[in-house]
Amino acid sequence: MLKRKELARKAVRLIVKKVPKEKESILKVDEFLGTLSTAYRKDKLLRNFFLSPQIDRNAKVKALESLAKKYDVPKEVLEVLEYLIDINAMALIPEIKRLYELELEKLMGMLKGELILAKKPSKKLLEKITKTINDILNRQIEIEVKEDPSLIGGFVFKTQAFVLDTSVKTQLEKLARVGGV
């Protein structure tokens, strides 16, 4: 029997192999896995639904298919997830999501990042920040924008392996630690 991490890696390799190599398809699968992972972690009812041996396999597959339809996920990805249902390994979904993002970085040269600003930026400013981050990291980046008024100004950009924090809040905290305030 494969260890859990090995099984998750194999599932991700299969998904990457089967997904069409178009940016749109790749990102749809990423969004789908993200939604599934978040729901699985936060919703006990959903988690119990997928892990319960008393619930019919077909009911689980139908639930998965209806969610996948909303995200227009290729059927090949569903085949991999159906296999996880068959071996009762849906608990691996959060790990599969994490590993899928790493594969996106390696194979596709794409990076997913989170940009946190004090207020919603203009389109022009967002493009400028994105271009600058693309140039710094030398990668194509898919950015998710979030607001956090506590930052006061500046921004925070996060990926799995990189954090760029230019926020006023952090600068003030650093000053306070040093004793400057």
UniProtKB/Swiss-Prot annotation:
It is a peripheral membrane protein. The lineage of its organism: Bacteria, Pseudomonadati, Aquificota, Aquificia, Aquificales. InterPro entries: ATP_synth_OSCP/delta_N_sf, ATPase_OSCP/dsu. F-type ATPases have 2 components, F(1) - the catalytic core - and F(0) - the membrane proton channel. F(1) has five subunits: alpha(3), beta(3), gamma(1), delta(1), epsilon(1). F(0) has three main subunits: a(1), b(2) and c(10-14). The alpha and beta chains form an alternating ring which encloses part of the gamma chain. F(1) is attached to F(0) by a central stalk formed by the gamma and epsilon chains, while a peripheral stalk is formed by the delta and b chains. It comes from Aquifex aeolicus (strain VF5). Belongs to the ATPase delta chain family. GO terms for biological process: proton motive force-driven ATP synthesis. Disulfide bonds: none annotated. The keyword Ion transport applies. It is found in: Cell inner membrane. One of its GO terms (molecular function) is proton-transporting ATP synthase activity, rotational mechanism. Gene3D superfamilies: N-terminal domain of the delta subunit of the F1F0-ATP synthase (1.10.520.20). Keywords: ATP synthesis, Cell inner membrane, Cell membrane, CF(1), Hydrogen ion transport, Ion transport, Membrane, Transport. F(1)F(0) ATP synthase produces ATP from ADP in the presence of a proton or sodium gradient. F-type ATPases consist of two structural domains, F(1) containing the extramembraneous catalytic core and F(0) containing the membrane proton channel, linked together by a central stalk and a peripheral stalk. During catalysis, ATP synthesis in the catalytic domain of F(1) is coupled via a rotary mechanism of the central stalk subunits to proton translocation. GO terms for cellular component: plasma membrane; proton-transporting ATP synthase complex. This is ATP synthase subunit delta. The gene is atpH. It comes from the Bacteria. Pfam families: OSCP.
